[in-house]
Amino acid sequence: MNSVFKRLKNYQEVYYLGENSVFQKSKIKGKFHSQYTRYGQPNEVAGGGFAKRELLELLPSDTEEQTDITITHRYDRNLKKDAFHLVITKGTGVELTASNERGLKYGMEALEKAIYLSNQQVVVPELTIHHEPSFPIRGVIEGFYGIPWTHDSRLDCIHFLGKHQMNTYMYAPKDDELQRKLWREKYPAEKIEDFEELLVASQNALVDFYYMISPGNDIVYTKEDEVGVLQQKLKQMIEIGVSHFGLLLDDIDYYLKGEAKQKFGTPGLAHAYLIKQIYSYLKNELAHSQLVICPTEYDTCYDSVYLHELSDNLPPEVQIFWTGPETLAHEIPTSDIAKMSEIFHHPTIIWDNTPVNDFEDDKELLFLSPYYNRSYRLNQFGVVGIVANPMSQWELSKLTIGNMAQLMWNAPGFDLTTSWQETLADYAGSEYVESLEVFTSHNENKRMIQPLPLELKEALEMRDKDNLNQSLTELNQAVEKLKTLSNKTFQKEIAPWFKRMEQDYQLWQAILAEDHELVRKLGTELKGAKVRIGTNLPLTAALLWGLVD
């Protein structure tokens, strides 16, 4: 395949006949002229401004320097948000059309990917690229139970999202008490400063920042002042510039009692009332706002009185979360979303609980799988977005989320095998791809796929020590290689599982040596360990073979 098509394979439409403009230099200069908006300072241009790039240096339209190409940026209201149309013509002309800043940024990224160096000459292919991201909303919801992320992790997450063509960060940590349990209380000044910093980071990365609140456990639906307290809590966020909000009514007892039951009759009508109050408030306070809600019945694939009453009584613009047919969905097939689209009648956002590991004993594990078992056709049935709920280990969550980003960006072109290789290479570099692939294959997300493949199950049942030894030797070597990866955050988060692998390998060596006393000692210790490798081969073998009680 031609190298230009290889570099641009993640874009939906690429037309290239093999013609190029060749410049006898190792870097070219481009003049940027926008008919879309006027930029006061060069660094305000989306996509990195006029900062130095590898092969292309952008200069403002009023530059007096000699340039090699001219990039003309135009606005087209008919293009979808985040879409772009890029045309590179013979000679010096580049036309980039978009309908928002992100579209401009993504078009500039495509231009940079198209340009390449050959024999110390810059080659600019003559081509046309048209791309519309498969989902308007693409990102992360910090919505897990357990210790919330640090402020630095959130900043890093926002940076990661912007770098990987995602555009949404949702703040919804279940154990932020002021977001859920103590929702009536205002945030202190220092916390507001953190939100302001997150908002600035989001704006710089062209990421939409959502503030989510969860009052459903104890809000009194019949008291107007309760709604007022909730509105004033949201006003704290409005005052610092937040315009995207979520009202979460998940994981609550939604059966009505007393006055609430007398007034509303059913939880669907009570929830619709509250949502409409918040929706109206946001519309009055802001010229532009967005509201997404999480219903209490967020994980079904069938209709109900609750969903009927809720969906029929909400303003049409309100978006609804759905996790798929289960809270931790093993799969989200086309048939299920087709059914739910007939039930919701509202724009739907998939709250995908992957790679989150906060359920039951999942916290002992790492979930490091590709983005398995999701329909590529979700956007054909009213799904406007996908947000991933990550692990508390943000750094390690980047693997699955980086892979998800590729489907969100271009669902028809998503190839699970090649995209996973690209994800691993993007994260760690080509030197570590093989080792990462081995380690992640032993730490699959058990909520999406069986963590123990058939060949290893059979090896355990048949006491096939040779095959098991080969697999464990490869895993041990992969861990040793990954220990040299110069990413301090990666090493800190993964250290407990590397330590567990060392202990597992000691147990395996004792099994091979038929040192039964040592096997019992090590196996008994590992039974009570706080973390474990997903395949858990040595301890499983010791238990299955009767070597450890």
Task: Label each PLM-derived region with a short phrase.
Residues 1-135:
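Contiguous, structured surface segment used for ligand recognition
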